[in-house]
Amino acid sequence: MDLALFFRNEVKPALGCTEPGAVAYAASIAARHCPGEPLSVALSLSLSMFKNGRDVGIPGTGGLRGNRLAAVLGVLAGDADKGLMALEHIDMAVVERAQTLLDAGMVTEEVVDGVPGVYAAVTLRCAGHEVTVTVAGRHDRVASIVVDGEVVGGEGMERAPEADGTLHGGASCEPSASFTEPPLPAYLEELRECDFAQLWDMAAGIDATLEQELLRGAAMNMAVARMGLESGWGLGVGHTLAAHAEAADLHARIRFMAGAAADVRMAGAPQPVMSSAGSGNHGITATVPVAVAAEGLGVSPRVQAEALALSHLVTGYLKAHTGRLTPICGCSVAAGAGAAAGIVKVLGGNAVQAERAVASLMASLMGMLCDGAKGSCGLKVATAAGEAYAAALLGMDDRGVQRPEGVVNPDIATTARALARLSREGFAAADAVMVELLGGGKH
């Protein structure tokens, strides 16, 4: 597998929550193709995009939230060249104008079925023109750009088969058209076929350039964690836990540092984090526990980098099975599993112990639901970080899950398949119910 390609695409900076970031990105592209004053913006979102963007803070807005705000900001001042960081340079004057347009009812939002988990279609109308930009499959993957009914750009999406079995390819200007998930990139298909020993060996084989990039990403997320400790952002999970913990307690420090970083991100601080598998909170969970353990135990930068690589690879492996956005909390289950494996590497363990740690983490947290991105994600991230360390300790002592326990198996491939089926089939109804509870009708 091309490791450089994996890390370039799966581990990169993101500003704010990636779901409203994707909406803002699509809106900023639409604005490029729609001259004049905006008249209306209509959002058509997947269940997951709706719930993950509904209550999360937008960076640079003073704590304002939501996909609709992200869309208007993207139209008014988004920089499409910056991708998921399209709102990096907005100011309060733009925010005030955006709020005025929202209050005037300029933006509508609806949840649509039959689309990939990552799906946002932004339709912008201005004088005499209508533009629809669709992001699908990945948060930064522009599937189609449709201007006045004509497809002018985008990678295209695979249409679901018609009743007669025929399949039609290409982009559509219909936001609610039925689409299947796009195929995984080749490097993720390769990753899915690996066993745990191969993941372990790949992490050990990173080159000097990747080593430095991984350490840079961890430093970025640790800086965000320290912000959360100092100021008590959001729910103040990390800040509060730190105030009641012994400084020398590594388990507690792993927990409150990860929670603090998520506090900052969910509150909408204008501070980028290094993401993993398309999610900033996945990136926090995958990196901060490993970095805190490495710092506390005084291991070399090389060991820390290999541990970070393993964490991202395990996270990516599990997400390649489940999909980008799921009813199960991927920050806890997938990235938590990655962190557990990475901490075993920091502790001087081996591949067998790390795989057992992954199984123990998943046995603990597999049922945790994702009810959207919001301040309380800090609680889930803190829990996952603490459980990752506990699972790593069990692995190091050759304890924890060593035979099938319920749906969890010590073999990562078997458990990944079970997790994928539970997420896509078992919890699908739960996702729909959650969106109803969150008010996911058109408004």
From Swiss-Prot:
A Pfam family it matches: SDH_alpha
One GO MF term: L-cysteine desulfhydrase activity
PANTHER family: UPF0597 PROTEIN YHAM
HAMAP family named among the record's database cross-references: UPF0597
GO BP, sorted A to Z: L-cysteine catabolic process to pyruvate
Family from the record: Belongs to the UPF0597 family.
Organism per entry: Nitratidesulfovibrio vulgaris (strain DP4)
Protein name listed in UniProt: UPF0597 protein Dvul_2496
Region annotation (Disordered) ranges: 156-178
